[in-house]
Amino acid sequence: MAATLKSLKLLRYQAFCSPSAFGAVRSVSYWNASSTQHGGQDPPGHISLCHSAKKVKNICSTFSSRRIPTTSSARPGLEFSKTSSSKASTLQLGSPRATGIDEENVEVFDSFENLRVFLQLRPEYRVHSYSASETSQLLSVSEGELILHKVRVNQNNLQAQVIVDYLCKLSSLPAEQHPVLLGSTSFALLCQLSVRKIKLFDTQDLINVLKAFVILGIPHSHSMLDVYETKCCHQVWEMSVDQLLLVADLWRYIGRKVPRFLNICCSYLNLRWKDLSLSQLVHLIYVIGENRQVSQDLMQKLESLILKYIDLINLEEVGTICLGFFKSKTNLSEFVMRKIGDLACADMQHLSSHSLVNIVKMFRFTHVDHINFMKQIGEIAPQRIPSLGVQGVMHLTLYCSALRFLDEGVMNAVAASLPPRVAQCRSKDVAKILWSFGTLNYKPPNAEEFYSSLINEIHRKMPEFNQYPEHLPTCLLGLAFLEYFPVELIDFALSPGFVRLAQERTKFDLIKELYTLDGTVVIECPDYRGNRLSTHLQREGSELLWYLAEKDMNSKPEFLETVFLLETMLGGPQYVKHHMILPHTRSSDLEVQLDVNLKPLPFNREATPAENVAKLKCEHVGVSLTDDLMNQLLKGKARGHFQGKTESEPGQQHMELENKAAVPLGGSLRNVADKSGAMEMAGLCPPACMQTPRMKLAIQFTNRNQYCYGSRDLLGLHNMKRRQLARLGYRVVELSYWEWLPLLKRTRLEKLAFLHEKVFTSAL
């Protein structure tokens, strides 16, 4: 494999290392301060040092008010300047917190040291990680000037080991001199010489030079580092696991992603994974997570190692493992997640808030409902939230909504803590928090203050929403679930300009979100006169959502049986229509229409062949409720109600409410029979005698994912749908999972009787 890599990279490697690439050494500064930054991105496909040198600006102007001559006669004393040092100290290029980063990495860099706390908890980590606390004997300014003088004088005769030694020594200069050193053309020359000699560096040389780069704050976007990554790629198979992890850690400290290097590391570790120690395992997962790069095959092997060491892992390491798997978008099995939940619950009071948030992220990602963990979150989170960073609060809130876990204490603490510090929120935080409250269909006691502060923050952050357009529809839908409709923002979100921006700038398809928003505002804001989604996009959204809903429902045998039983009870498929009454609400319904006599109408023309329409007569079809059939149905009255048990969430029996018995058939069915005489069901009338429906029923086949966890409270989207159906004159008939699913095991007559009760009692 190493040979293959070498052959693939050889041409590029030679281009970087060829001495002919440095013809512009003395005329142009080496540093590319204005180049495109690589933070969070893959390095460019090909970068020539010579080409880079020809187009870059001289970084000396950033750090020093004068140019430094590069001839061998230049006085060493001119290299360092107290005044230029004070000017240069305004920016530390090497600090991760000073580098340009995209939104998704803000949290990573802002909490850089928190992410590395686990490295301080075992001495074994020192062998394969870099610590900023490492110290060496300081080099005086005069000694540094002398080294740079030697570089200029002896540039054609410097050996590889001497170059490495010079770089390491210069990194020992006082910190305030580092920016001045970076502005020195002599130091740029030294770095160029290091690239020229890099083929002669061994693994330890590479490590020492990378450490020097970390200390000095070499810009992570510098093209020279691409040469070093290539060298690291060639060196992988000569490294030990400890050296491999240390090199990866140094790249992390520099702030540059090195995908080629990590790909080869994964191949290397796929062969040696069984020999990883606990500290190596945790550190490797950290490195994989921070680089968002993963081999699924390797991650499965690492999961088995987690189980091997599970009893030895401390809580900070648990948080690191969860974060690594979360960032690499890799699942942990339910079994492992329950083990992790048990560890966290055993000592949650001593679990740091940082690790708590990381564990919460992974539970959200895997959708594992660890009941004891959820309970303890409900107890401990309200105490932690006031001191938790805004992004941590967002992740905690999003965890609750993803698992449909409504704990009012947690949500109230979030709502109380946010208004005073809402300015600290990113657009992403505002969006996810509003979405979470809306999804759980929960208004906190301070709803007015809470929502006004967040809506105002949306207005203030409009430039950021333009940069990350996917967050604006999320905000507005979260608000719409709870009947908040900021018209100006909705008008902007549905404007052609923003829709076009959303399609161009985001990797997410926002048509579903915008279509849901568009359909909602039409029904709930009749006076709205703002922008609407184009007809083309409305049709596209409708077709997409119907395809998904139809595919989902038709894959459920219990739903198909329900449709068949309704058709049987009412008289045929023309009396029932499976469609999306409100396409923008993302779920389908079974529609039934009743006339003034509460008899079903054959309104579903799609289910009636055209050649048969003319033959339809007002003849009775369907099931006639004769005295014998009524007696059979009513026999169960003496035995009491059906005892169908609710299917509960996994392991949540003690959280579920008491199961209600199914609706009794006796009295109510008699009442229906009394009101409708013989109660012969469903007379089929031809179109000529079709009546305007007195009542339109939306029969909804629900499941537990439409309710808050362990309760019968609808989630925001489904509650909004029922609200809108009512506005349009529909009466919702709910076939709830806790009633209907147990009944599917009963006889056909019992199912028909239950459906009859549901349909016709709702009409009364």
From Swiss-Prot:
The annotated transit peptide is positioned at: 1-27
What ranges does the record give for the region Disordered, renumbered to this chain? 68-94
**Where does the RAP domain lie?**
697-757
Biased region (Polar residues) positions are: 81-93
InterPro entries registered for this protein in UniProt: FAST_2, FAST_kinase, FAST_Leu-rich, RAP
Cell compartment(s), UniProt: Mitochondrion matrix, Mitochondrion nucleoid
Residue runs in coiled coils: none
Single GO term (MF): rRNA binding
Q: Which residues carry this modification: N6-acetyllysine?
A: 507
Record function comment? Plays an important role in the processing of non-canonical mitochondrial mRNA precursors.
- Protein family: Belongs to the FAST kinase family.
Q: What is the designated name of this protein?
A: FAST kinase domain-containing protein 5, mitochondrial
